[in-house]
Amino acid sequence: MDSGAGKARSKKKTLPQEGPHPPFDISKALRLVRTLIKKYKEPVVTTYGRHKNRPAFVVLISCMLSLRTRDEQTRAASARLLARADTPRAIAALEEREIEELIYQVGFYRTKAKSIKNACQALIRDHQGHTPETMEELLKLPGVGRKTANLVITLGHGKPGICVDTHVHRILNIWGYVETKTPEATEMALRQKLPARHWIEINNLLVTFGQNLCKPVSPICSQCPLGALCPRLGVKRSR
């Protein structure tokens, strides 16, 4: 037997295994993001959340318009529609074609025009023109999913809720704060572990952060103040 080969085998080193990541400091991360995003424009839905008159309804309409649409187009379409009609009754009185012409810049504008008109009719029929405050009632409205409902609850009514869009879902998985496959699963995980003081703000913080720095394709990690905190899970390419 070749003793040299046996010695070579005995000297073979085992590569160290990567250990578990330490708990992610979500409060510190959000504090850093909060400071960072002050120089960026906030999401249009957040802007409309400060509308002095009928904020919940304005948030509802702007969020329905925002789905799969850039903020610039959402902002312009929301302004045109709400300048023409800014109550459920006023919008319900418009022809569907009129709504289409006012919001044509947004994606799927024909589908959204139909959903918005139908939602306004439902608000009049079932809620005396008021925008509901509960997830159950909001989800009954045409064209309204959990993201829109949570934004109406948090920004429109100022009540506890967690809105999770694709940016929030993606970034929290990069941070390793959650390990989830869908935005809805992320929302449910956050309801179990995210401190309540961060519930309302997290969507605005991470959407702005995701639009400007932690981008879906090639995030700008070289300029990110979270470098020491972020494990960059799943990030294959960055700048």
Predicted regions and their residues:
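Catalytic cores of DNA base-excision repair glycosylases
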Residues: 13-239
